[in-house]
Amino acid sequence: MVRIFLLYNILNSFLLSLVPKKLRTLFPLSWFDKTLHKNSPPSPSTMLPSPSSSSAPTKRIDPSELKRVFQMFDKNGDGRITKEELNDSLENLGIYIPDKDLTQMIHKIDANGDGCVDIDEFESLYSSIVDEHHNDGETEEEDMKDAFNVFDQDGDGFITVEELKSVMASLGLKQGKTLDGCKKMIMQVDADGDGRVNYKEFLQMMKGGGFSSSN
């Protein structure tokens, strides 16, 4: 199955959190794999696991974690993800999917048939993907490498201020909109003072809780 996952970041105070491969849905591998074309996502049938096909989750989902991820899609905060909101989120990442395919994606998750995805339906999907992650044998080290590669957009082994800003903007996040704000975040974890974050610094940052800001 095509590997799909979602990174989300920024908690209450510029805190970067990672959900490694927990949301293998909606976002094709092509967004992360620089050798592929961003605008050629796989079909919805290969992108979305079916929540009903999974057994009951063995891991308790953190409600606050679930809510943060859900709110990234629920732009107007009404408790439902519409097709339009899904489309906007994908377009923010440079991913363009035909209207009929978006409808199929919503339909696959939409248990009550109202044409939207509510928090309960999202939790069912999220739980099945978390369960799959815990059973697929992948390691935290692999997750960290995948995450670093998303931020390291040019593949040079460093996360720059510009790259951090680009990723945050593509995820539609409000925090860190300015280069100055992102520069302060980089400085928090830039141990060698070169203005960039290398993989070692990235690992140390993740162990410490994430990018933080005194603002």
From Swiss-Prot:
Which residues are involved in binding Ca(2+) 2? D110, N112, D114, C116, E121
* Record carries keyword Repeat: yes
Q: Which Pfam families match?
A: EF-hand_7
Residue ranges of every copy of the EF-hand domain listed in the record: 61-96, 97-132, 139-174, 177-212
Q: Tell me the protein family, please.
A: Belongs to the calmodulin family.
The protein's job, in short, is: Potential calcium sensor.
State the name under which the record lists this protein: Calmodulin-like protein 5
